[in-house]
């Protein structure tokens, strides 16, 4: 079951922390992957690689907001 399948019930603080932790790890994994692939894609298209690098930066910003949300719980 995927996490958005449980949207029908109120989350406890523990569940919210668990969800945020999962999202943070997920985003960090994507950010790393984006950077690795951007390096490979540079050979095909410098512009596309720059776009992917920017996506990694934006993902990092999303992750920081999720960390803030975790602190604000």
Describe each region flagged by the PLM:
Residues 28-49:
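Short E/K-rich amphipathic alpha-helical oligomerization segments
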């Amino acid at each position: 079951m995927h996490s958005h399948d449980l949207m029908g019930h109120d989350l406890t603080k523990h569940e919210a922390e668990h969800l945020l932790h999962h999202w943070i790890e997920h985003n960090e994994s994507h950010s790393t992957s984006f950077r690795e692939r951007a390096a490979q894609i540079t050979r095909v298209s410098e512009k596309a690689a720059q776009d992917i690098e920017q996506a990694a930066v934006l993902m990092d910003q999303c992750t920081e907001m999720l960390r803030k949300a975790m602190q604000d719980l």
